[in-house]
Amino acid sequence: MEKDAKIYVAGHKGMVGSAICRALQRNGYTNIITRSHKELDLCRQDAVEEFFSREKPDYVFLAAAKVGGIMANSEALADFMYENMILEMNVIHAAWQNNCKKLMFLGSSCIYPRMAPQPMKESCLLTSELEKTNEAYALAKISGLK
């Protein structure tokens, strides 16, 4: 990436997104764009389209997600699947529409089968049953990858 490229980090307040921002800054990237959930609701297609149309990021790191523990994932399956799929599709589509050079979508270890051999390999994806407690989140992540 060019040092002066416009880089949007979605999910910059989370563990992974904040680490991406720190790594970019440490490596001399200064044109990093971030928005809090209050400033930009990634589940609202109109807001995402307007943001991408105005900002025109060259590169996008998609680290944003609705996350929760075992209890939250178990009690709100549909919410986790819906919100994650919507925000992923909104960002991926807006990046494509606005000629983003590259988009990095981040997965999770939970997208792999519950009993995947260690170390996990990409070829294990969708080969057997997912962990039930985060299946909805995992399926949303897999749909973004595919």
Task: Enumerate the predicted regions with their spans.
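N-terminal Rossmann-like NAD(P)+-binding domain of SDR-like oxidoreductases, especially those catalyzing
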Residues: 1-146
